[in-house]
Amino acid sequence: MRLNAKSRLFAIRRNSIHELGIVVHISKTLEELAQENNITDIRRVTLQIGKVSGIVPEYLVDCWQYYKKKVPLIDNSTLEYEWIEAITICNECKKTYDTIQYGRECPYCKSEHTVLLQGNECLIKEIEAE
């Protein structure tokens, strides 16, 4: 079987369609910020990614590498990320806990009346531009 470059890119995108959509959204947000601030070249973008966001960072970086070639503003940029811990609060005892370790059930009072406080977001933390 022969695989050309276009087939490979399609395979990458097909396996990470969620992340490609995020990259497109980030790119559009960066274009708006660049226009508002007279920025012509973005060198580095740092994201904060929630640990329970469902985002696969490796896929996100792959999609960034693919998509940035289509956008002159970010074509020389790198994408970095930091994790945001997943924290849940219990509505019964009002204590917070690590969502990944304990899930939905509060480890203190065993209640399932809990709410995720943080950890499912994806934020642009910092942009390095010229």
What are these regions (language model features)?
Residues 2-77:
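Long, charged N-terminal interaction/targeting segments
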Residues 48-52, 82-86, 127:
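Short loop/turn motifs enriched for small/polar and acidic residues
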Residues 114-126:
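Short metal-binding segments enriched for Cys and/or His
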Residues 98, 111-115:
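Short functional micro-motifs and their immediate structural scaffolds
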Residues 88, 104, 122:
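Cys/His-enriched microdomains
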Residues 78-86, 95-100:
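Short, flexible, mixed-charge glycine/proline-rich loop motifs
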Residues 90-93, 106-109:
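Short cysteine-rich clusters marking metal-coordination/redox-active sites
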